[in-house]
Amino acid sequence: MSVNYKSVIAMVDDALNLVEIVEEHPCPNGSEWVIYQYQRTSPLILSAWREGNKHHFVTKIGKEKLNLVPSLSAAGIEEVYIENNRVHIVYAGLAGGGVGAELRKGAKNVLEVNILEKGGGSRLGKAEVITPKMEKVIIGIDDTDTKEEGATWVLAHEIGLEVEKEGLGYYLDHTIVQLYPGNPNKTQNCVSIALSFAVYPEYKYKLDKFIKKLLKERSLSDETAMAVYYGLFPSKSMKLFALKAKKEMVKIEEAKSIALRNNIKIIPINGEGGIIGAVAALGLAEHHSLAPKLCEDIKL
């Protein structure tokens, strides 16, 4: 039986000169040891976290030699560079950390793995993993249901699966964002949804058209809207708007102003009622501990 990573995805933000690497680890809940060691060892890594068995690394583009020391700094990412629309990632590690570098070979979305040094035992292992260059697109969706039927989170999840099935990219995340419970226009729980995708550059601007078509066909509401953000990290102003939308009623003009300031594309599907929730969802798409909370339970 072979033990391999399930997938490796690299999303590039050309404006920031950063890459977000998402790896699906072979173990059921991933490896917090890998997160800790990689971040401790690698000067290129700006942040790292784990969501289940998915490891996320935000890295600079460049090369930094690793000072590998058993137990203390055992494994990491030595180099990240882009060439011909491919992302090259060089991993290095001692003992098991080095063996892990080789296990990306059978992963989905990996084009090629070059073993630079064969690891195992107490030896250094080093491997170059090559993936297609991808980009992150976050979609906010709100107001697809009625008081009688439907659920926005379910429809959004179905759409995420359809995007992946269509081959436009990878469905990375589904975030339920709690909004202001006192909203008189809510159907019930007053939540909106953010979907995160890794997409191939040639499909970057086709994704919203595909999702718009599905929403048009499947939404039950007359006020459905979506919002689209291109980039790894929603801005501080987007986050603050989302937090405000948890606390109180906000005007649609404010949502449109935030969208204009952050190059967010607003797409009304059946109306404009869902615009506020769709834009707000984008601001907390990357803040999973804040997204589900009521305003009174958030300490900033």
From Swiss-Prot:
InterPro entries the UniProt entry points to: Methan_mark_11 (IPR017674), TiaS-like_TCKD (IPR053870)
Pfam family of the protein (one): TiaS_TCKD
Domain of life: Archaea
Signal peptide: none
Ranges in coiled-coil conformation: none
Name under which the protein is recorded: Uncharacterized protein MJ0921
Species of origin: Methanocaldococcus jannaschii (strain ATCC 43067 / DSM 2661 / JAL-1 / JCM 10045 / NBRC 100440) (Methanococcus jannaschii)
Native organism taxonomy: Archaea, Methanobacteriati, Methanobacteriota, Methanomada group, Methanococci
